[in-house]
From Swiss-Prot:
Major place of residence: nucleus
Protein known as: Cone-rod homeobox protein
SUPFAM superfamilies, alphabetized: Homeodomain-like (SSF46689)
Subunit note: Interacts (via the homeobox) with NRL (via the leucine-zipper domain). Interacts with PDC, RAX2, RORB and SCA7.
Organism encoding this protein: Bos taurus (Bovine)
């Protein structure tokens, strides 16, 4: 009977052993038992005597070293790891109690200020006290140019926006007022341009026939092309006779008549002695008036 219950060794079939390590004797539908699930550690329940020992050590130090923990663990008959976890939880509980006491001592208004609501950037405008003053004196608002006292165009500086590509004035208000007050003196300078109305430039083709109306805005920069016929003769080397003085007013320059002229009349080629007066010595060998004075150097 026992021989029937305990079969003999397996015989090989076609030289293959059925009990080898590579032979699966179980049906594939039958699964193997899985590894046992790790059970959760049980909660430790401390007795009154254990808590008294732990609280006594916690009153001495909140961070005991490993030797102090092992000593207490031997007294209360607990592993050292449980004592370490108890101290960790006790420190967290102590911090929580301190925060609650601070919140109870503070008034309700102080609690709201201690933890303000987080606002998004750019939602609320800045107050006037937060805005830094502009060191250059440039304001964000545009102001038109101030008129001068005599009605003439002045060099008043207009403040523009800081984002404008136009030129900005780095001058303070005091210097700006000084520039406005000295407007007439600036307009009398030879480089101040008087702007003519647009109708004087492009109203009709007849406007181009009058040089005074066409060049009225450029008179301070342009000297008259041709002096009057009765004026003094031009000399290429004489400074004062080149043209009228720059100190003349634009109205006097624009009022001059530009007549037709001939290079022969203006430069007076007919009389070379009166026009082409070179500052040369009469005995100079380059004097062309006396051909007998011509001298040639032999090379």
């Amino acid at each position: 009977m026992m021989a029937y219950m305990n079969p003999g060794p397996h015989y090989s079939v076609n030289a293959l052993a059925l009990s080898g390590p590579s032979v699966d004797l179980m049906h594939p539908a039958v699964s193997y038992p899985s590894a046992p699930r790790k059970q959760r550690r049980e909660r430790t329940t401390f007795t009154r005597s254990q808590l008294e020992e732990l609280e006594a050590l916690f009153a001495k130090t909140q961070y005991p070293d490993v030797y102090a923990r092992e000593e207490v663990a031997l007294k209360i008959n607990l592993p050292e790891s449980r004592v370490q976890v108890w101290f960790k939880n006790r420190r967290a509980k102590c911090r929580q109690q301190r925060q609650q006491q601070k919140q109870q001592q503070q008034p309700p208004g102080a609690q709201a200020k201690a933890r303000p609501a987080k606002r998004k950037a750019g939602t609320s405008p800045r107050s006037s006290t937060d805005v830094c003053p502009d060191p250059l004196g440039i304001s964000d608002s545009y102001s038109p140019p101030l008129p001068g006292p005599s009605g003439s165009p002045t060099t008043a500086v207009a403040t523009v926006s800081i984002w404008s590509p136009a030129s900005e004035s780095p001058l303070p208000e005091a210097q700006r007022a000084g520039l406005v007050a000295s407007g007439p003196s600036l307009t009398s300078a030879p480089y101040a341009m008087t702007y003519a109305p647009a109708s004087a430039f492009c109203s009709s083709p007849s406007a181009y026939g009058s040089p005074s109306s066409y060049f009225s805005g450029l008179d301070p920069y342009l000297s008259p092309m041709v002096p009057p016929l009765g004026g003094p003769a031009l000399s290429p080397l004489s400074g004062p006779s080149v043209g009228p003085s720059l100190t003349q007013s634009p109205t006097s320059l624009s009022g001059q008549s530009y007549g037709t002229y001939s290079p022969v009349d203006s430069l007076e080629f007919k009389d070379p002695t009166g026009t082409w007066k070179f500052t040369y010595n009469p005995m100079d060998p380059l004097d062309y008036k006396d051909q007998s004075a011509w001298k040639f150097q032999i090379l």
